[in-house]
């Protein structure tokens, strides 16, 4: 049998020796500091693959691309819905079971509410100042309270409805202008433009990020906005990386293993270079120059909040960190959901026919669909749910960290374990879903499909949309609005068909990103009266 070290290129020998030495010291410290436990059933770890001395499963993780593939193949070989991987003494617990996922985010929610403290998280959150990636504690609770009660309140979201409607109209204007020029629509790109523009409107009150306010008259992004959007996705793609450095970070920080430290630092700095001048200018306006006549967007809301003593509640640095987090959290889900949903509808014309029938019955063709129509668009929401189930935007829910020793599925979970709930492992699990790879929106309808409203939230963890528990997404309302409005406006406004120059429809999935391996390029034709198509509004 060939040894692991002889199969590695020479430069990795040195790195391996260093990792082995540091991991040995780390593991020894963990063993010595861990209290002695009796060997009963509650102390048995979940099943896992055999590992190397000291390093555990770290070498296999290091050599596998994409990293998520290693977890998936190992669990398949082990024939288990919960597994334990040993990365130099750090336990990574992976979950494919809805029952165990519910236990994790309900019964054990308090035990598992922490986040791993990683370089990527620290960089994006500017030393953990934002909510979503901060460790469980005072800062997390403060930012969650602010966002829940103010930023995502019914009052604030209603205030921003006009801004979202502008971008829903701009979406239609953009597609219509492409039809007039006989251009092919890149569904992924267009959906990302919509998500970006809506997020910028709600966050900063404008879609442009430069003072020059340069834009085209048809809805395209300017060069600065394109670059901003690009680096937002570059930053997002750093999460999660499952880099070996995540598990032995104490010793590998600064070594730029996998290049992830350099990537996340460079891209975060560029995102901030666009965001921060807007924030600094607005902070000065509100806190030094008397402010504006009224609060108009999320940034205004953050800046003007005060505590019971009249002191400003959120610091400028906290605002900046939270704005970066909002940027990377708000755009990818609607775009990914839109591309896959439209692709599945073109593959299954009967599903498309039912969706159009619902739109024509609920909204008609004499006006554009509005946010107020969303509660009545159950079939469209069922389509969005089915896409969430079978085509998630990421392999895993953002990692949780065990704050103390606990149990899951009857197995012992040590303090400090990283908890990874697999999205495809739930949504495509034949133990949970009949014919899991068949796209069938009807499975999400109850009764006649009309009486009981469909929501995008899946509280039973049979698949993951917005997660749940203390770390669940608190932007469910606005996320639902963005997703359903994007799909509804696309379908109501246009007939879609494959473009002859791009070959047959392919729903093949990229194994690393879970995106369509081949971006969806379509031709469009208007299906409404010409006077209903709005003009672009900057």
UniProtKB/Swiss-Prot annotation:
GO terms for molecular function: heme binding; homomethionine N-monooxygenase activity; iron ion binding; oxidoreductase activity, acting on paired donors, with incorporation or reduction of molecular oxygen, NAD(P)H as one donor, and incorporation of one atom of oxygen. It is a single-pass membrane protein. One of its GO terms (biological process) is response to insect. It comes from the Eukaryota. Induction: By methyl jasmonate. It is found in: Endoplasmic reticulum membrane. InterPro entries: Cyt_P450 (IPR001128), Cyt_P450_CS (IPR017972), Cyt_P450_E_grp-I (IPR002401), Cyt_P450_sf (IPR036396). Disruption phenotype: Plants have a bushy phenotype with crinkled leaves and retarded vascularization. Its EC number is 1.14.14.42. Keywords: Endoplasmic reticulum, Heme, Iron, Membrane, Metal-binding, Monooxygenase, Oxidoreductase, Transmembrane, Transmembrane helix. GO terms for cellular component: endoplasmic reticulum; endoplasmic reticulum membrane; nucleus. The chain crosses the membrane at residues 8-28. Its cofactor is heme. Its main location: endoplasmic reticulum. Highly expressed in cotyledons, leaves, stems and siliques. Detected in flowers and lateral roots, but not in the main root. Expressed only in the vascular bundles in apical plant parts. Signal peptide: none annotated. Changing residue 83 to G: In strain: cv. Se-0. It catalyses: an L-polyhomomethionine + 2 reduced [NADPH--hemoprotein reductase] + 2 O2 = an (E)-omega-(methylsulfanyl)-alkanal oxime + 2 oxidized [NADPH--hemoprotein reductase] + CO2 + 3 H2O + 2 H(+); L-dihomomethionine + 2 reduced [NADPH--hemoprotein reductase] + 2 O2 = (E)-5-(methylsulfanyl)pentanal oxime + 2 oxidized [NADPH--hemoprotein reductase] + CO2 + 3 H2O + 2 H(+); L-trihomomethionine + 2 reduced [NADPH--hemoprotein reductase] + 2 O2 = (E)-6-(methylsulfanyl)hexanal oxime + 2 oxidized [NADPH--hemoprotein reductase] + CO2 + 3 H2O + 2 H(+). Catalyzes the conversion of the short chain elongated methionines di-, tri-, and tetrahomomethionine to their respective aldoximes 5-methylthiopentanaldoxime, 6-methylthiohexanaldoxime, and 7-methylheptanaldoxime. Belongs to the cytochrome P450 family. This is Dihomomethionine N-hydroxylase.
